[in-house]
């Protein structure tokens, strides 16, 4: 089982399933719930006080503009947008007229944004985020020495998985520490035994190990930068 939503028809997961004659089920172990404007106000956040916004995900984009609308805040055309990736920057078009706006983006990792913060150091930045924030983000922003404020605009919560028989699966694949938490919350009596566990990212690995779970498959690595590559390599190793 892959703890993500079902992918499109062209997904590498579906290609692996067909090629290796295995069955892959998709089920998100976590989901996002937005905070309301009342809760945002308790964080002492006034959207009009900021001249720049830092977006690290599409969820952050959606919930920022949702709350802006709820609070009747008209986002000014002069707002500067710093996006972690080009995909997130392009996603802004869902909410704003992209042309003529002050939009910049990095390659992939948050640390890649450091030159942009040095280029635009005088903005007062708002960071819309979930209740879980990577320490890399805090470290990069503090290194950049810019004026920034975090606003928790949505929360990552455990989904209800009680309709699943978790023991039916030979392998479970996780992409976040919250996914591991959801496993424990939904299946408090889960015993790993012969169940193989795959994880993506060091923080997910750490969460699994902390929960006493043995990890059999890890990505990204130099050889397997994606989970699908790691999974295919693992399956092929079983045939040897």
Give the label of every model feature segment.
Residues 1-240:
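Conserved beta-alpha
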